[in-house]
């Protein structure tokens, strides 16, 4: 049996993706980037059909087609997300299946910004993609350079409209198809694009550098030692002796100190993002901590009942609802590890939400949850997933 390739972490890692209107060349650009970098020995060339036949993934009960390619520049290691269909993009961005540190917005110079261009920019803004680099594609098909200048101005205005620094965002012009076909000048523009991405999109703060957060999945007692809360560490690190807070489902925040940590039945000095651990808590009774709460670094997260959310509602074919819903709809919101009933209030001018819609609304929970801007959730009804979303604004 062949040994698995070991991932060697020598360069900083950044997650990016291509966004933009259908047929503007997102997948062609993805293929062109890998092809051009492959010539420098920094990537494996992926052809269009490989990327376009994206495998299905399940993220929190929702099926999404996503292609992931990886490549390197001289400075960084990139994981690049590309989704074949428009609905896949929306689901990807809202469920956080592909958490992007930055995005390459692809706009065809032949068309200019189109409806999905706008929708993707809005979504990127809502889900916290703070850095966008623009690639004006198909420039070889436009004879008059002044027309390309006009398209660039339109794109900059559109970005400004959604609170991006439209005047300062870097714009690179080129032709992804020509680069794929081996045109030297077009390939130079692809390298210029990647240099721009290297420079403009900052290296993200690593998950381990963020404040500790662990959703509690299970609670048990070790006789003579105390109460253990177990779960997967979402972010940050925790070590024996750390002070933590138990937050969520009740208004009162409990404080405790970590007196022991174990993973796979072995004791541990410290745990970090991604680890499944049991955390022994000093002075906490078995019934004072429950599934659905979180353990967190003191002061790092609070409970809230009311928030605004950006949501994708599943279609009937995806196992979602068969009928629309209206304001006052009361499903369960599954946060971290538990369901909390909440009432939905649709924005003014929205009568109802149809299966398949991507929408924004306000939620009021019947119990407080440990949430913040960017917290992901699914919407469930009788145990089945009918939607997925994330918190875009806290309202209380």
Swiss-Prot record:
Residues 82-85 are annotated as: G3. The gene is tuf. It comes from Lactobacillus helveticus (strain DPC 4571). GTP hydrolase that promotes the GTP-dependent binding of aminoacyl-tRNA to the A-site of ribosomes during protein biosynthesis. InterPro entries: EF-Tu_GTP-bd, EF-Tu_GTPase, EFTu-like_2, EFTU_2, G_TR_CS, P-loop_NTPase, Small_GTP-bd, T_Tr_GTP-bd_dom. Residues 20-27 are annotated as: G1. GO terms for cellular component: cytosol. Keywords: Cytoplasm, Elongation factor, GTP-binding, Hydrolase, Magnesium, Metal-binding, Nucleotide-binding, Protein biosynthesis. It catalyses: GTP + H2O = GDP + phosphate + H(+). This is Elongation factor Tu.
């Amino acid at each position: 049996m062949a040994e698995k390739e070991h991932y060697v972490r020598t360069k900083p890692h950044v997650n990016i993706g291509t966004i933009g209107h259908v047929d503007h060349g997102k997948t062609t650009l993805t293929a062109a980037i890998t092809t051009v970098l492959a010539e420098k020995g920094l990537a494996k060339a992926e052809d269009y059909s490989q990327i376009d036949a994206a495998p299905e993934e399940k993220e929190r009960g929702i099926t999404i087609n996503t292609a992931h390619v990886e490549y390197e520049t001289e400075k960084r290691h990139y994981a690049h997300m590309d989704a074949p269909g428009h609905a896949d993009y929306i689901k990807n961005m809202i469920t956080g299946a592909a958490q992007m540190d930055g995005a390459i917005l692809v706009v065809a110079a032949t068309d200019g910004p189109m409806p999905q261009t706008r929708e993707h920019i809005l979504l990127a803004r809502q889900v916290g993609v703070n850095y966008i680099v623009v690639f004006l594609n198909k420039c070889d098909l436009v004879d008059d350079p002044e027309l390309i200048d006009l398209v660039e101005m339109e794109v900059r205005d559109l970005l400004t409209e959604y609170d991006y620094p439209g005047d300062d965002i870097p714009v690179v012009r080129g032709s992804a198809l020509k680069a794929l076909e081996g045109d030297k000048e077009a390939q130079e523009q692809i390298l210029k694009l990647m240099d721009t991405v290297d420079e403009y999109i900052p290296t993200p703060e690593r998950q381990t550098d963020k404040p500790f957060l662990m959703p509690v999945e299970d609670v048990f007692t070790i006789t003579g030692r105390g109460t253990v809360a177990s779960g997967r560490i979402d972010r940050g690190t925790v070590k024996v002796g750390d002070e933590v807070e138990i937050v969520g489902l009740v208004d009162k925040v409990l404080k405790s100190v970590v007196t022991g940590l174990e993973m796979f039945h072995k004791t541990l000095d410290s745990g970090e993002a991604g680890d499944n651990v049991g955390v022994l808590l000093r002075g906490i009774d078995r019934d004072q901590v429950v599934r659905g709460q979180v353990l967190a670094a003191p002061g790092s997260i609070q409970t809230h009942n009311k928030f605004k959310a950006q949501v994708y509602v599943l279609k009937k074919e995806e196992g979602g609802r068969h009928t629309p819903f209206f304001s006052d709809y009361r499903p369960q919101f599954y946060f971290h590890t538990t369901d909390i009933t909440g009432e939905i209030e649709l924005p003014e001018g929205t009568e109802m939400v149809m299966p398949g819609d991507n929408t924004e609304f306000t939620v009021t929970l019947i119990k407080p949850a440990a949430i913040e801007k960017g917290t992901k959730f699914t919407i469930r009804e009788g145990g089945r997933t009918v939607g997925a979303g994330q918190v875009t604004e806290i309202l209380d």
